[in-house]
Amino acid sequence: MDLVALTYTSRSASGLTPRDVDLIHRAAITYNPLDGITGLLVYNGNGFMQIIEGAESAVDDLMSRITADIRHNELEVRDRRSQAERCFPHWSMYRVDVSPSFERGLSGVEDAVTQMIDASMRAVVVSSLAAISTPA
């Protein structure tokens, strides 16, 4: 199996509610195990940053569904890489809600996942959070 990790950012659609974000997360934790997907979902009130891990075909299929989802605007794939092993093997989709402020948002994500990602993935996370953050 070719294991890939894909990181994307998107702006949340206007009028997105906390319940909508809960529904996105619940769908991920329900369906991702069926497709062999694991990862991390970060929401900061402005947008999403997500790392999706799995077989290349499963990741591509999921990204097609996310791209078509009207709850996401300005979706941008920020990184795609082959991996020898998963960063988040036990998380069908771990969710971290953080502050819209870049500095506080980064701190929240680092607290949750710093031991699980390498330096190059950390750089992707930092630049991705910056893309969806508001000034401090």
Model-derived features: where do they sit?
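Charge-rich, low-complexity N-terminal segments
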Residues: 1-136
